[in-house]
A protein has these predicted regions:
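Hydrophobic core of alpha-helical transmembrane segments in multi-pass integral membrane proteins
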Residues: 26-41, 89-95, 178-183
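Alpha-helical transmembrane segments of integral membrane proteins
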Residues: 25-27, 104-112, 171-176, 196-200
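Structural signature of hydrophobic alpha-helical transmembrane segments
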Residues: 75-86, 139-148
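Alpha-helical transmembrane segments in multi-pass membrane proteins
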Residues: 108-112, 116, 120, 200, ...
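Interfacial segments of alpha-helical transmembrane regions
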Residues: 89-116
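N-terminal transmembrane-helix/juxtamembrane module of multi-pass inner/ER membrane proteins
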Residues: 2-82, 125-132
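Aromatic-anchored segments of alpha-helical transmembrane domains
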Residues: 36, 114-122, 178-188
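Membrane-embedded catalytic cores of phosphoryl/pyrophosphoryl-handling enzymes
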Residues: 131-222
Length: 222
């Protein structure tokens, strides 16, 4: 009887994590579709008028007329740069490996940030050189938006698995979402085109979704 119960729990737990992995792969596919859509809009210059309208509106804000506010925005955007994200990912990897005693997850987290960022950066440069012949938006997708969506996206996806306290979970969840939105808004105000920011977000988000999805498919738990 107990043996049958144990078998039932084992059989039920595996599809649970597999369904989570499938959900993440599906979500990554949605971000991939949005990225392809943004590539098409930029490639055929449909995003140019939208970017110019947002750029002109951003220039009319008081942030561009104040050197202090501009400096604050630049410091905010550094929270999503690869120079900030890569060392921080090492700290998160050490935390997951030692404090949470999950070496596989810690190593996977660091490798995900490093490898996905390198892969997506290569794709970014390839697209930038291709689009440069057809569009004025040569900075597509934005590297900072890519880095912050990848790193903070991984943290957002790990929060439900690592933290059980619901209030703390909600605070961290919405704080990270707010930080992503704030850094993206700061990039736009500083003159980065909206299409470049959205393209970077989509690339980073699909990288985070596929990374955790692959991890769940391989290890079946976090």
């Amino acid at each position: 009887m107990a043996e049958n119960s144990f078998k039932n729990v084992t059989i039920q737990s595996k599809p649970f994590f597999l369904s989570q992995a499938k959900t993440l792969f599906l979500l990554g596919g949605v971000f991939s579709a949005f990225f392809i859509l943004m590539v098409g809009l930029v490639f055929f210059d449909y995003a140019n008028s939208m970017d110019n309208a947002i750029f002109n509106f951003a220039r009319s804000t008081p942030f561009n007329s104040s050197p202090i506010l501009t400096l604050i925005l630049q410091n905010i955007t550094r929270l999503g740069s690869s120079q900030f994200v890569l060392p921080l990912s090492l700290l998160v990897g050490v935390f997951l490996s030692l404090y949470r005693r999950n070496l596989a997850l810690g190593v996977w987290f660091v490798l995900s940030v490093v490898l996905f960022e390198a892969l997506l950066e290569s794709l970014k440069h390839l697209l930038a050189h291709s689009i440069q012949w057809f569009s004025h938006s040569a900075n597509f997708p934005n590297a900072t938006a890519l880095s912050l969506a990848l790193f903070y996206g991984l943290l957002i996806l790990l929060i439900p698995h690592l933290i059980t306290h619901q209030t703390l979970k909600n605070i961290l969840f919405y704080s990270l979402f707010g930080l992503i939105f704030l850094i993206g808004l700061a990039l736009i105000v500083l003159g980065v085109s909206l299409s470049s920011v959205l393209g970077g977000f989509c690339l980073g988000a699909l990288g985070a979704c596929f990374s955790i999805g692959i991890y769940l498919s391989v290890f079946q738990k976090i």
